[in-house]
Amino acid sequence: MGDKVLKIGSVHQCNCCMGSKTLHPLVSVIDLSKADLSSHTDFKFGFYTILLSECKCEAYRYGHQYYDFSDGTLLCLTPGESISMKDSDNTCPSKGWILAFHPDLICGTALGANIRDYTFFSYRPEEALHVSLREKQVILELLDKINQELQRCIDCYSQKIISKYI
């Protein structure tokens, strides 16, 4: 991890840093192929972050390890964790997705009550979830459903619907 870690405390701040529009203050789906990550590669997120890497021959550093994501890999970070998103050329990924969601989004939902049971959020820094092509397709479909819900006006059902997709 480099000396200059960008601390991102909110979903809105994350959107601003990555050149995305904020559609909901507590959740965002960010397409890394459209993100502007030229000025930073090391991040500390103040919210849950799920990173789906679709890049070939790129690596991320999480903890003290680098990961080679040749087929598709999922990293799940809890609020306060850091990640270095760069490959061997010190450039950021060009393909993948970030699902960023604040703990307040899942408060009072089944996901909020059970998130500690999802062990992939408590993996050691040298662990990650490698996903099959079919698993990646399912994840992308769910991200698309979240994005579709975000395109609608926020209402009393948004939180429950989005948390079910997560």
Report each predicted region and the residues it spans:
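Residues immediately flanking
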Residues: 55, 79, 101-103
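All-alpha amphipathic helical-bundle segments outside canonical DNA-binding/catalytic cores
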Residues: 152-165
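Short acidic-glycine-tyrosine-enriched beta hairpin
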Residues: 64-78
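Conserved hydrophobic/aromatic beta-strand scaffold that supports enzyme active sites
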Residues: 29, 50, 74-76, 98-100
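Hydrophobic/aromatic residues within well-ordered alpha-helical segments
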Residues: 135, 165-166
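Histidine-centered metal-chelating micro-motifs
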Residues: 75, 80-86, 106-107
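A hydrophobic/aromatic-rich effector-binding and dimerization subdomain
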Residues: 88-153
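Generic protein-terminus/edge-of-domain signal
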Residues: 1-61, 65-68
